[in-house]
Amino acid sequence: MNSKIQKMELNDGHSIPVLGFGTYATEENLRKKSMESTKIAIDVGFRHIDCSHLYQNEEEIGQAIVSKIEDGTVKREDIFYTSKLWSTSHRPELVRPSLENSLRKLNLDYVDLYLIHFPVSLKPGDELLPQDEHGNLILDTVDLCDTWEAMEKCKDAGLAKSIGVSNFNRRQLEKILNKPGLKHRPVCNQVECHLYLNQSKLLAYCKMNDIVLVAYGALGTQRYKYCINEDTPVLLDDPILCTMAKKYKRTPALIALRYQLERGIVTLVKSFNEERIRENLQVFDFQLASDDMEILDNLDRNLRYFPANMFKAHPNFPFSDEY
């Protein structure tokens, strides 16, 4: 099946499909599900798959991709696969081994995009969130410019076609962009972005610097108890959004996704439900009028569903700045 998903050019000459399939699964029993849903996503036309070492399901996602290559649904070059460097591997000597470890699990020769997942560095080791005896995270101090140099080497070695960052604020992006001897610019910054956190200032800054903004959490959140405040409003229940959905005869989710695409944002969407996975591709079947875009712009309330407060003590915590 030919994918109707449009692509956006990156600053290094590669291009990224503007709609991506997210694979984050919180619990072990969902990892199997993430494999099945990734197969479905590829079958219905998704070509951009977003994963990470942190999600602990790269093996399953790799199996899904390889099985779809083996059955002739896609070729490797049809798939745009993103992986991410976790915070316990920021030290330069750990960057390439971490990527190679992901590639082994995936059974792939390269990733299309490799991101620094979060700007906060943690103590190296097997524990994803290393803690001391009091339950506090054990932080590490690494210059992100040194990490970036190691990322550049991964690109030069052909292990990653493109490299970028995630959850960086403007100041942190500037630090990389102004690094002496910078060889490769970040192609993107993947951040939480939705109607209640529309990231308009960060988006403007990224566009000015030819960096693509990639949105996660574009539909709000699946309300994981461990990481969000349950008192936060449910984005897809927003009355203005629901009224607009009726006007366009679409679901609130499709309006929320279309809003991002109209702004030139690459958007990730995650579902384990086959019907919804198919439905999400309908985002290319309509457009929003400019006055409706303005109405949606005004829903912004600077609300983070993923505040990542456990990292607040680190000097590189990204969300204390305005953007």
UniProtKB/Swiss-Prot annotation:
Site features described as Lowers pKa of active site Tyr, chain residue numbers: 84
UniProt keyword Zinc-finger present: no
GO terms of molecular function: 15-hydroxyprostaglandin-D dehydrogenase (NADP+) activity; 17-alpha,20-alpha-dihydroxypregn-4-en-3-one dehydrogenase [NAD(P)+] activity; aldo-keto reductase (NADPH) activity; aldose reductase (NADPH) activity; all-trans-retinol dehydrogenase (NAD+) activity; androsterone dehydrogenase [NAD(P)+] activity; bile acid binding; Delta4-3-oxosteroid 5beta-reductase activity
Protein's name in the database: Aldo-keto reductase family 1 member C18
Reactions catalysed, as given in the entry: (17R,20S)-17,20-dihydroxypregn-4-en-3-one + NADP(+) = 17alpha-hydroxyprogesterone + NADPH + H(+); (17R,20S)-17,20-dihydroxypregn-4-en-3-one + NAD(+) = 17alpha-hydroxyprogesterone + NADH + H(+)
Family annotation (Pfam families): Aldo_ket_red
Taxonomic lineage: Eukaryota, Metazoa, Chordata, Craniata, Vertebrata
Positions bound to NADP(+): 20-24, 50, 166-167, 190, 216-221, 270-280
Tissue and organ distribution: Corpus luteum (large luteal cells).
Organism expressing this protein natively: Rattus norvegicus (Rat)
Main location: cytoplasm
